[in-house]
Amino acid sequence: QPYFNKMYETVSGMLAKSGTVRYPGKREKNPDEPCKKGVIVISSNRGLAGGYNSNVAKLITGQEDWKTEDVVVYAIGNKGREILERKGYTVKESYPEVIEEPAYAEAMLLSQKLLTSFAAGEIGEIYLAYTHFKNTVSHEPKLLKLLPVEYDAEAGASTEGADALMNFEPEDVEALDMIIPKYISSLIYGALMEAAASENGARMQAMDSATSNARSEERRVGKE
């Protein structure tokens, strides 16, 4: 987790210095065209995990300014895909097997597909919807914007002294062009690992709750 957090901070810091991201061969967007959002949605293939899957789906359905037709879903896990399909969202790709055994190679392949669509102008923004793992009993649904990367200008200014020590070879924009594919792949893989841990924790909590409720009901019936 610290590695992936540092990756995000580093790319954001570079953007604070360069001020933009220019991806190789990216087609200029027609201002009259809607900005389509490519969203990687990480859920599970099974139920019995409390609100784990529905909470991830709500990260998308709860965006009031997002039109259903402007969202393109890349689903990892069947449960999130099923919820979003019922809500009318377009699922372009589905990878139910990836969440069973998360691997960096799978994250890299998905990253390449997304960046190809981004460069072609088919999608204008890339998001990642997953469950952030805090500990075994605490998990937080999280929507992270991957591209275009947003950074805090004030935070960038506050670290100006540190940034001044950074030298880019080649130039910063060229460096970003090389880093962005690894940046996207790393964040997808990190989210997969966190989601897998969160799913296990959520399922344990759900089963513990079900067991506790069953015992309470057993005691109640026994008293009657």
Regions found by a protein language model. Give the residues of each.
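C-terminal beta-strand-loop-alpha-helix "lid" module of Rossmann-like NAD(P)-dependent dehydrogenases
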Residues: 1-223
